[in-house]
From Swiss-Prot:
Rhodanese domain location: 341-449
Principal EC category: transferase
Gene it is expressed from: mocs3
Cofactor(s) needed for function: Zn(2+)
UniProt-recorded name of the protein: Adenylyltransferase and sulfurtransferase MOCS3
Single Gene Ontology MF annotation: thiosulfate-cyanide sulfurtransferase activity
Binding site for Zn(2+): 216, 219, 291, 294
Disulfide topology: 310-318
Amino acid sequence: MDETDSQITCADSSVDKLSHLKRNEVKSCPLPELHGADEMLPELNKSCLTNPDILRYSRQLVLPDLGVQGQLKLSKASVLVIGCGGLGCPVAQYLAASGIGRLGLLDYDVVEMSNLHRQVLHGENRLGMSKSVSVAKTLRKLNSAVVYLPYHISLNPENALQIIQQYDIIADCSDNVPTRYLVNDTCVLAGKPLVSASALRWEGQLTVYNYHQGPCYRCLFPKPPPSETVTNCADGGVLGIVPGIIGSLQALEVLKIASGMAPSYSGVLLMFDALEGRFRNIKIRGKKNDCAACSNPSETAILQDYEAFCGSSASDKCRMLRLLSRDERLSVEEYKRLLDDHVPHILMDVRPQPEVDICRLPHSIHIPLKGLEEKNEKWVSFLRTKIAELITAGNRTEKTVITICKLGNDSQIAVKILQDLFGKEDLFIAKDVQGGLMAWAENIDPMFPRY
């Protein structure tokens, strides 16, 4: 430490604290007020490292590529983490531990039990608490010298610029397409580097947008994908450690930029496959001269309706499709009455096998949606056999098939396929259960597992 000490020109026995917060404590209410475009956050003017700083950061201070000057840059940097979930938790944790000066934590959501396997800064005692406040509360116990600003709000075209322009670096840890476009366009307008990551199932991706002359998100994706092809963690699942790994690498990119080093993934996409244990770097195309966002930032349509543009909600919650008419759907209450009245029918569970293994209604048959979409002869033949058994057992000619899934999305798709396969047959009726098995658990059987 002698070499490091010789570089320190001054020392202070105290560490910086937030004036409105006690040490190692965060208030859950009230939340910080949003600052307008003309009410900029105060500049972080730290001129030297304190003795407590030297002790706390000593293991990274001795790194030649960082050193005292790099640590000072970190202490004067402000980072906004958008999304305090599976990615945002490791990002915020390592940024706080490394000594970032100010950390904005933005999330509209509250902590739920299904978050805890991957969102490791929350806990069972935080259920129902604002995620941004929960993260700030945990991190203040880790490093009270960092300024934490939790925002319990949804980012939208009306508030995005006034928030983002007050930070040096933006970490996009969101889980929906409209927010990614909104954050990208706002970063272009504000001239901020954007460190963006995603994680789904066993895979993760990471890249840096809008850094120097590098591309932005719209350069790569001028148009959003069809909403029905987009899968998030709630729909597709994710192994908890995958966002932990990608989020840690995301924090590393932020730290490099904040300390004055060049990021590794500007113009490069990192792809991680947890099943194979493999990392791959893919060079991505450069900045587009005709990009709608970064070719002329002053004309970027920051106030556009991003949900309409993407055809999906700016939320990581499961989307709700509306493919069927009301007459083609049954509420869980209506289906319960149908059961109680012993109306002959086939209940077809169209979820993937791993979900069926979690829970199922005992009288249902299982035909996965994928098998129907592919018109797999095995599954079509199986269904025809069950329909024949229904007619024989009930001494009826009416063929009623009711589809069910987790939330009532795939079941609607299944009805459309059934109508295509069997719709021309006499007395064939296909309907789905609105809200699926989770609505059944919510409104009919509280002991039915929720996932």
